[in-house]
Amino acid sequence: MAINKQQLVKDYEEAFGRNAALPIAFWHSDTPIAKPEKIGGSFIPVLEDVRCGYPVSLDAETMLCGGGKCYCGLAPLPAYVPTFVSEKEHYKASAELVEKAISHMDIQVSPYRYINFQRLDLMDEGIDYYGVLIFASPDVLSGLVSWAYYDNASQDAVAVPWGSGCSATIRAVIRENELMGRQCFIGFFDPTVRPNVNKNELMFAIPKSRLEEMAEYIRDTCLFNGKAWQKVRERINPE
């Protein structure tokens, strides 16, 4: 079912209020939507620009983070990553464990050159995007998780994958959307990414395959019915 983007954005803003960050869509293409600029280190800080309304495009030449290139589908996984994650960052007990964890991500290099990020409300109609990323405080997460579980009885309808900020959100969404899956993800627990985001925010990620379903039911959920969510919404949007 195709998403009525304008209606979804309207419903989202009504449900969460003006202080909640709007969803960021992302997709690959052969043509950038903005001039790519070189970024050293993590590219996650540029998502703050996207949140503010600016489109961003990156390719393998402008994204210098080896892991970021890989998890965004712009280049193969660098050979040093498993050892680096284990022996330098100490996030896994061994390089073999890192390799095993990464194997579950089924990483593929996109045939397209660029990865693009743009706020959903500003994106052109007809773009085949992978899903959305939402910067979320604990209160906003409460609403997003409640929304995601509304029509899904699975205990892992919302998952917290191990990995870097981009692997646990961007790569997870790409793969889930390819599988036409129903799982959403919470990311940005990785200590390496934390200094690059607001201290009271994580990232909620929804594949388009799931967003199409969630958009249909949003007005039936607690976000529009009952009194509990309204108290949380008021705290997100104080007078």
What do these predicted regions represent?
Residues 3-239:
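Acidic, serine/proline-rich low-complexity intrinsically disordered regions
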